[in-house]
Amino acid sequence: MKNNNRFFQKNIKVLSLILLSVFLSGFSISKQDKSFQNDLEDNQAKPVEISSRVSPETGSDIKDEAQQMPVYGNWETFTVKDGLPADKAYCVRIDGDRVLVGTSAGLAVYENETWKTYTAEDGLAHNGVLSIDVSELTGDVWLGTLGGLTRWSAGRFETFTQFNSGLANDVIYTVICDGKDVWVATGGGAGSYDTYTREWGIYTERNAPMHEPWTYGVCAGGGKIFIAAWGGGVIEYTKETKQFRDYVDPDGEMEIDLFPDDGVIHDITTGVTFADDILWVATYFGLSRYDGTRWKGYLDHDSGLVSNFINFLKADGPVVWLCTDLGLSSFNGETWVTYRKNENNKKGKIIITEGENTKEISSTTSISHEFVIGVDTQDDVVWIATSKGVSRGEILKDLTAGL
Amino acid sequence: MKNQDQKIKLRVLVLTILTMFFLFPVSDLNGQDKKLNYGNTTDELVPYGRFQKAYKNFFDDVQPFTGAGREKVPPTDLTEVRIGFLGPLEGSILTPLGIQMLQGASFAIEEANNKGGYNGIPFKLMPHNDVGLWGAAANEVVKMNDEKVWAFLGSIDDINTHVALRVALKLEIPMVNSGDPDPTLTETRIPWMIRNIADDRQSSYALVNHIYREKKHSRIAVLRANNRYGRVGIMEFRDAALRYGFPLVLEIRYNDGEIDFATQIERMIKSSPDAVVLWGNAKETALIINQMRQMGMEQPVYGSDRLMSKELLEIAGENAEGLVTTCQYNPTLDEPNLVAFNKNYNERYGMEPDVFAAHAYDGMNLIIEAIHKAGLNRALIRDLLTDHKTFQGYQGITGELILDPSWNDIGSIWMTEVRDGKFDFFPTPPLISDEQENKKSTP
Amino acid sequence: MKRNKKIFLVFGGLAIISLFFIQFHKWSVHHVNYITAVDDHPLNCMSCHLYIQKDGIAAKLINEDYLSPYNLSLAPDGKKLYVIAQDANALLIVDTKTNKVIDKIEVGEKPHSVVIKNDGETAFVSNQWADNLYEIDLTSLKVIDTLKTGSGPAEIIFSPDEKFLYVVDSYSSEVSIFNLQTKTEIKRLMAGNNPVAAVFSPDGSQAIVTSRRTLPIPYGTPPMTELTVIDAASQRVKERKIFENAYLMENAAFTPSGDLAISTLIRPKNLIPSVQVERGWMMTHGIGIIESGNEGRMIQLLTDEPNSYYSDPFDIVISPDGQKAFISHSGVDIITVIDLNEIRALLAESTQEKLDYYSNHLGISARYVIKRIPTGANPKGLVLSPDGKYLYVAERLEDKIAVINTETLETINSIDLNGPSRITVARQGRRLFNNSGHTFQNQYGCYTCHPDSHEDGLVYNMAGADMGRNLANTQTLRDIGDIPPYKWNGKNSSIYKQDGMRFSTILTRTESFNYDDLDALVAYIVTGIKNPPNLRYNPTGELTAAQKRGKKVFYRTHTNCGKEIPVENQCATCHPPPYFTNMQMADVGTLSDTDDPMLFDAPQLNNIYESAPYLHDGSAATLEELWTKFNDDDEHGVANDMLKDQLNDLVEYLKSIRDAKYYKDDVEEYKADINQEN
């Protein structure tokens, strides 16, 4: 007892401090729990912690397919100051010697190192151009806008709306050309337009396995059309049989992913792309990959994906490009390369992740903004559309070049 | 020495008592928070919670908006500050609700303008009907963008609200939803919308707790509207009932506009339920209740939030007695702001405000206040609405706003029971956990 | 007694006959006056009851099967002339030495054009109403292959290396490109509206395609017609040249040096009140020119003269020396010869502003028109001999080929294609239809606004004295004999009335047709104008899934909510088969502020897909717009409950509706349904 007393006597201050700190920590925990995290400060592009948290890839086939991953740099940026009609660019499409950019204030065309803008006054359905594709057959440019679908053919604008045509809805998130057919993902269902027969198709919950008619992305490949249905996962349409099937999140819950790699990560899908027999699916909850047999999921905590919030994606051969709210990621099944902007010194960051190893390299040039909305590649060049300007990067033949 | 020991003992005792005094509430708080899963979900109601921990919980954190826009300089030549409104204004069975919603929003605008608008510039409401032909909601939001609104309020119908939200994201327009209780609306990670009305998840939990744990029913038949409100609304109820160990004995549907429900009621009778849950709009539900009683079904009836309506009482009359529903607020509370709103609204529009008017009023006030604080910049208005600080705990006429990480309102929800031809409101009782339930049932 | 009885019977009989005759005469006068809307018609029963017989023995007896030469090609050595006999579905081969028809090859329905390969051994013929090409071996004179095209294949051209074939799909407004090695269609390029002709530039770098109809334009604006330029290397459209205030660009030609590309065209003043006709200049006719220099400057020049118009320019050919152009004016039976050096000089000395002024100048043609050569009825296709010495002219309604010496500019020969020698009443009517002789100063013929007896897609200010009042969308004349009344407001109870007094008062502003001519014109309109097969949307009669769903929507009696649709607001009430018109007047809520009050004659829906724009004033650009823009109050059928995919289905069904002859069963079914309901 005496010892005890002595102990108390000696350590009374320490004990008091401990007790006080316990109290304070309890209080602070309770306060934090009640008010949640303040993201206002986080809004300013908080850097993602890159560490060795990445779990090893499990799918051996992915490794087998992986090829050498190119690294891009020498970023050149274009904004209103350079001739863009608006800084906010929704999409970009390389078309031979020119580059087409869909902005919030019209279509911008970069040719011979100058920008030219086309707006609703010229015949665009709406100045908000969300998606662009070019028909390989005819060279016609198809523009998905906030106010309808426009075909731009050798200078002539032809507009299809839900009022003058069979278009499902005027808000067109994605347009693609598939041979003579044009497919759209709209706010009122997916749609198809046969440029030969002029027949429109509308695909909604009334005739396809969707819960609701909201669609966000569409792509073609392997004799199929894949539709990113908002809340309905991925809808697959086989052209030959004209049959639909769907791929949904097996756990059926919006708030969780129960098991990794059990199917598409989430039913709210934002984009689809198909290349090399692989279907890639973007969500605001991560990335999914489907090889026709197995699904594999990628999240920011278990892979080199920089953010789960994926605005758009596009596969080019073995490489898939991911436009996220924290930069541009690219992935070939084995290696991740992410391009970010260093807010402190305006330089760029290249983050390379392979298995559990992550390396960050500083680059002298940077993408124009980390909120990336669109991407397109051709040969050794990549173009991206961002929340503030568009950027053009090129393959760094010598990785040290430009770094 | 003895004195010293006593002194020490006393000090320790005081300190211990003080510590215990402070620690108890903290531990109590922590204890409660430990139970709080996403959406106020108790442990036993967590999806797959009894069997498997989820690989990823998507709404543990907040989705930031990292895009550009905060740097945009506000215009200096404005003559009005436009705020959009999207609701069912004509051509829909929801039109009466949409009109109330519009009036609630307009009322807030009028009050704000009476106080000088935004730095002397009046606010202007830009109403848009979401029920136009051939899928209007998406186009209407585009029109709002062309009209240069700074934010908008909308809507009630699930489908239209979802569509509007998608466009709001693309156009980056802050959106406040005050009328669509679809739980999936805020489960999209779109950082451009907050909701200031409790959702069907909260309604479902309240009903499930009341029906199974308090009233001890075990065989529930559901008759719901064959629309998204009915389909999505019942989902959380169905799942929660299942997780409590009581799968629904029957779930059947009816179409909007139907007037004869004999077939469905016969099926319900055959399923021998000991209570019935109705999820749909007031008119059809009232007719169903009448026909149920007519066909000899005397089981207690529980229902969704839209049943708390004058129309239901008028059509169902005495048959509505005992009907228990949820409601996202209590319009009969003796809160000065609420009382004043009810009175002024009645004077202004010649009718009592309903749940949509009241939440629209609160929602519009959130937008107005956000504009006042953030200025005329959409991204900054968004930042404010979603920062979990500025409006966390906001006291509106509909109660306290508590936003979860997905910006869903998980504040309190009320329940009502029809007694003597009126809706009697009572607070939702705390959810009874498995442990408490087991204790109760063990002698 | 017996005699008296006989007398009584005879006189009684005579009295009854007289009475009957008087009554019959009275009825006949009333009937004829009602039908013709005049009171001095000679009461020739045959006018209506014989000449307008469409089938049966009488029809066979009074009508003939004509050839109607339309387009021509010459063998590379010039020894054989290949003639498209449009009405005989045949390719005629003429020996240019003897000027005799030496062979006839059966081709597909309504052939349009023929091209011959450089080796002279193979020909391709486009069958406009069969949507295909025939490949013909000219040695064996056999059809050796059939290539499926887009809709309404018209002109065909080879790429310079003859590896590819470009086909102008006139109905679907495209150009199909075929790989001749694989005989496959590799792509279709969007062309202008209703393109018909194409020609490669002399250097082979590009092809130009002319079109007849204006592009879809904002309501109430003048026509804008596209000339499409296709880059031969990429086989993509590289430019779309828009000729403003012009249309009906039927054909085009390059000068041998390529310095000029010239197309025929018409400049309509459709938005000017039609009273302008009696002041002239309502329709002017001429050429559109594109210079290879001057950044591709575009010019329009008239071939008309003050107080004399040369209507409906059709084909154009240019002499091998590049000095002269020859234009067939099918509305006035004239070949105009143009001095291209004068044109070059005019272009060289004129600013764009000056040239714009010339585009409306009736006197400028005196500078470059060097000769007007008369031809037989309705000259169409032209071809020059390889040495340029002879011009062959297809005289379509003469069944002959005129041969003109290009040095003397005189007709030196006429090749008889051995068609029927007799000119039937209907044939005479067709000549009248295609000729401008009855219009004040020959400004236009029926054909001008009704090319192919169909419609030109323009909206006219009919008879109104004020700008923009009473605008009327041109209506088709195909198969209209059995569906009176006529005009949008249904004021004309018969074609006699439509094309009689009213015609001269409002449209031609000259003396009206005499009764023989009127009989002939009516006979042609009633018997000679058929709907093309609807190969595009309903080739076999088997409806697509969407069309079947749309048919249900068309015949529905209840809304999506289960509410009964009032009979007068159901589609099939006003649009019952076989013509899909009940021939009654109705108010569908589409009267505009600029219209005088009127009800609308329910229009027929056969082949409705090729009649854009829609509504009486052409305000609906597409079928969809009928319901998305002009039916707010469900007056034009209850449609506002429909989902978009249902509307699409309905439109697909409407586009599938073809000629009335296919809907006899539907009539019975429809009547049975109605009876059942009643």
Which residues are covered by each model-predicted region?
Chain C
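Residue-level detector of Asp-centered blade-edge/turn motifs that repeat once per structural unit
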Residues: P76-D77, N118-G120, P160-D161, P202-D203, ...
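Short loop/turn segments that connect beta-strands within beta-propeller blades
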Residues: D95-N99, D137-L141, N179-K183, D231-Q235, ...
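A detector of repeated loop/turn-to-beta-strand junctions in beta-rich toroidal repeat architectures
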Residues: P42, A88, A130, S172-E174, ...
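Surface loop/turn motifs at the tips and blade-to-blade linkers of beta-strand repeat domains
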Residues: I62-D65, K104-G108, T146-G150, R188-A191, ...
